Amino acid sequence: MKGKSSVMEKLAEVVSLKLNKHLKMEGIELIKLKLGVEIIFINISKLAILFLVSYYFGLIKETIIMLAAFGFLRSNAFGLHAKNSIVCTVMSLLMFVLGAYLSKYLLFNNYMVLASFIIVNLLLFRYAPGDTEAHPLVGAKLRDKLKKQAVLMGMLLMAITLIIPDELIKTCISLSSYFEIISILPITYKVLGRRYKNYYEFERTIKQS
């Protein structure tokens, strides 16, 4: 993975330097530009791996649906991130390729969808949004706003899933919603040895300074 990271770093440096001929950035701003470009390239490479594997197994449609549903909820509920690119890629394959494969055999009907989303929305109301050490969600107003929006997104996704006639799509969306919920549960933080409610530490530091 060091070789891959080195390639990404070099590629990001080349692209950022070319961009900087027009942007004229210096110092910390140039470093931020390079890091931003590198993150984009890393995410593109992870998506490419995900789509290639799902295409190989004939699951591309299901994988895209699961990614879209997951991203829809995560945009406001947030949640844990993997600590490195390899773990992130492996977890993505497990969730969105293996999950897509399992969806073909589980096949949720509307009763199962309704029961699933009642649980999902209750857990969103209780635990969303989930933050990380690198991205603490500072401010009670912000967290309250994100919580309300996350529940609203959950309700909207439930309505869409109930309306969709295809049981395979219903199952893909439901499983993706479970995966997002898992990423915000306190037990998940505890099992993975990650700090929960990171904004506490951040806000306490601000008050002490």
UniProtKB/Swiss-Prot annotation:
Entry keywords, A to Z: Cell membrane, Hydrolase, Membrane, Protease, Quorum sensing, Transmembrane, Transmembrane helix
Stored InterPro entries: AgrB
Subcellular localization(s) per the UniProt record: Cell membrane
Keyword Transmembrane carried by entry: yes
Membrane topology recorded in Swiss-Prot or TrEMBL: Multi-pass membrane protein
Any one GO BP annotation for this protein: quorum sensing
Keyword Glycoprotein: no
Molecular function as annotated in GO: peptidase activity
Domain of life of the native organism: Bacteria
Entry GO CC: plasma membrane
Function (record text): May be involved in the proteolytic processing of a quorum sensing system signal molecule precursor.
Similarity remark: Belongs to the AgrB family.
NCBIfam families: PRK01100.1 (NF002210)
Protein name: Putative AgrB-like protein
Organism of derivation: Clostridium acetobutylicum (strain ATCC 824 / DSM 792 / JCM 1419 / IAM 19013 / LMG 5710 / NBRC 13948 / NRRL B-527 / VKM B-1787 / 2291 / W)
